[in-house]
From Swiss-Prot:
Disruption phenotype: A double amb0994-amb0995 deletion grows normally and has wild-type magnetosomes. It fails to sense and respond to an external magnetic field, i.e. bacteria do not align to the field. Its main location: membrane. Belongs to the methyl-accepting chemotaxis (MCP) protein family. This is Methyl-accepting chemotaxis protein Amb0994. Pfam families: MCPsignal (PF00015). InterPro entries: MCPsignal_dom. This bacteria makes up to 20 cubo-octahedral magnetosomes of about 45 nm in diameter which contain membrane-bound crystals of magnetite (Fe(3)O(4)). SMART domains: MA. Only the C-terminus (residues 321-436) is necessary to interact with MamK; its addition to MCP25 confers the ability to interact with MamK.
Length: 436
């Protein structure tokens, strides 16, 4: 009775161990992604071994120990320890086959895992040539290995494609940006130099315009003096006419005296004509001075020449005035002589009166011309002031352009630096992708 109960208990214990082993096998295969066919083969072998063992009657205790060892190894492998093995395979029949199958299964799982790890680790460093070696693998493990190898091959192709894209597409763009930044930096430097040169030129022109303004003021002063001289001439002519008028009642004494007075009057006319010519030339020179001042290019030099000519003409006018004064004095002398022969020069005095009136009219016309010259000189002064104001504006604009050029140069320098950094980053990234 006790023997029967003991056998029943051992048989019951074996019946409980077998499902446990089967569950652990299922867990191990789930962990490893194992084949369902292999799983059922192991289960079938296990059941046959157990049934055979029970049938034959063998040692239930030893069988229970072998199954316990198998369960322990399967538990370790299910926890991720693929180094676990059944070291002392003592079972025979179904139990022995189960133990050997477990060891072979773990050998395959470990070999596949190590190969997969080595291949993926190499790929992680860019060495895609490392593939999973399928020698010794069976069934689904071979399929899994081939799938991983194909994935590694595709990854290698994609990396190569990306590196080619980076070298052929991205890198040229980065280089183009860097070249453009360098060119922009050079252009901004040239622009800054040009702006600085423009500012210096504007300063030079401003100084020349200021000098031109001073020269125009000098011409204006000379014209005022010239106008005063004309007025003085007019006064002297009127005085001469008055003297001639006083001699109107004096008779002419001799023909010679009358001719002398007539000749003196003619010389006065010639001198007045000379004054008229000088005034015309002065007017022309004033016009040239206005044009030279408006050009603002070489205003200083051109205007200096014109001012010198005006000065010479003013000197000629002074000499003509002196000559006129001399001739008027001569007229006075002739008039004094005419007083002695008042009866003889009555008709001549009348002619002198008429001539004096003509001279006065000519002097008035000359005075009008002088006023016009003064007006033109004033306009020239205004134009010179406008040129000075414009040059100041140009100088300010050039200064702003210089500042802007400096800002562009700074931006271009920063862009160039960033382009260099980007180029280094792209090169480094390509290097990391190509040789990880």
């Amino acid at each position: 009775m006790e023997t029967t109960l003991g056998s029943y208990a051992r048989t019951l214990s074996l019946g409980m161990l077998v499902p446990s082993a089967i569950c652990l096998l299922a867990g191990t295969f789930g962990l490893l992604g194992g084949s369902s066919i292999a799983l059922w083969v192991v289960i079938a072998v296990s059941l046959l071994g157990v049934v055979g063992g029970v049938k034959i009657g063998g040692s239930a205790r030893r069988m229970a120990g072998d199954l316990s060892t198998a369960i322990h190894v399967l538990s370790r492998s299910a926890s991720g320890d693929l180094n676990a093995r059944i070291l002392d395979v003592r079972g025979s029949g179904g139990i022995g086959a189960l133990q050997h199958s477990i060891n072979r299964l773990l050998d395959l799982a470990e070999a596949f895992g190590k190969e997969a790890f080595a291949a993926v680790e190499s790929a992680n460093h860019g060495r895609y040539y490392r593939r999973i070696i399928t020698t010794g693998l069976r069934g689904d493990f071979v399929l899994y290995a081939k799938t991983i190898n194909q994935a590694l091959k595709r990854m290698e192709a994609r990396d190569a494609e990306f590196i080619a894209f980076a070298n052929n597409q991205v890198k040229p763009v980065v280089n183009a940006v860097a070249a453009a930044a360098t060119e922009l930096e050079a252009s901004s430097g040239a622009m800054s130099a040009q702006s600085t040169d423009t500012s210096h030129q504007a300063m030079t022109v401003a100084a020349a315009a200021e000098q031109a303004s001073v020269n125009v003021q000098a011409v204006a002063s000379a014209v005022e003096e010239f106008s005063a001289s004309i007025k003085e001439i007019s006064t002297q002519v009127h005085r001469a006419a008055a003297v001639a008028s006083e001699a109107a009642g004096v008779a002419s004494r001799t023909d010679t005296t009358v001719h002398g007075l007539s000749d003196a009057a003619q010389r006065i006319g010639a001198i007045v004509s000379l004054i008229n010519d000088i005034a015309a030339q002065t007017n022309l020179l004033a016009l040239n001075a206005t044009i030279e001042a408006a050009r603002a290019g070489d205003a200083g030099k051109g205007f200096a020449v014109v001012a010198n000519e005006v000065k010479n003409l003013a000197n000629q006018t002074a000499r003509a005035t002196e000559d006129i004064t001399s001739q008027v004095a001569h007229i006075q002398e002739v008039a004094a002589e005419a007083i002695k022969a008042i009866q003889e020069i009555t008709r001549t005095v009348s002619q002198i009166e008429e001539t004096s009136s003509a001279v006065a009219g000519a002097v008035e016309e000359q005075n009008a011309v002088t006023v016009e010259i003064a007006r033109n000189v004033a306009e020239a002064a205004t134009g010179t002031s406008s040129v000075s104001s414009a040059i100041i504006t140009v100088q300010a604009t050039a200064a702003e352009a210089t500042e802007s050029a400096g800002q562009v140069a700074d931006a271009a320098s920063e862009l160039s630096r960033q382009s260099e950094n980007l180029s280094r980053e792209v090169d480094g990234f390509i290097a990391r992708i190509g040789g990880r």
